[in-house]
């Protein structure tokens, strides 16, 4: 099965819809600079969300070879702060799909350069919608969980999505 994208550089491009292009995660590294911190020298929560959102968009595009926008964020849990000078390692993985949407689980860890040890500081689900050049939703390949852990993450993402829909979001 194929789908065509209209408009932009990809106009007329045939896209294979038989399965995802890649189910591998995306990991990115960012450094916490002074402008990223508050009066307590800790990373702004909004800056961390932006870093995580970028990783979610990257892994969604890698998964489906589409352009994506963020439609919602759910179950975001800030566990520990990150400080100026820390490195932030963000890993995003597609764990759920629907017709137009990729559910992405994102985990952020801080790396303290003095000890070179990582600790998880935040995690959550980002729901990304594939769009065409007119900003209209378009279909994406579907993710099929393999194994207990992938099924567990699928179920968590589905529960988060269902809760958002029930709340009218």
Task: Identify what each model region corresponds to.
Residues 5, 15-17, 23-28, 83-84, ...:
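HotDog/MaoC-like acyl-thioester-processing domains
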């Amino acid at each position: 099965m194929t789908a065509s994208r209209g408009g932009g550089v990809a106009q007329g491009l045939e896209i294979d819809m038989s399965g995802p292009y890649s189910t591998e995660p995306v990991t990115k590294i960012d450094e916490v600079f002074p402008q990223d911190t508050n009066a307590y020298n800790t990373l702004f929560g909004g800056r961390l969300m932006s870093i995580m959102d970028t990783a979610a968009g990257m892994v969604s595009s890698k998964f489906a070879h589409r352009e994506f926008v963020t439609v919602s964020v759910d179950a975001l849990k800030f566990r520990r702060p990150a400080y100026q000078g820390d490195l932030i390692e963000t890993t995003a993985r597609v764990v759920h799909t629907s017709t137009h949407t990729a559910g992405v689980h994102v985990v952020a860890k801080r790396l303290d350069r003095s000890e070179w040890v990582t600790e998880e500081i935040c995690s959550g689900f980002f729901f990304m919608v594939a769009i065409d050049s007119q900003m209209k939703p378009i279909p994406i390949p579907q993710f099929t969980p393999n194994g207990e852990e992938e099924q567990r993450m699928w179920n968590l993402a589905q529960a988060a999505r269902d809760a958002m829909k029930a709340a009218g979001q």
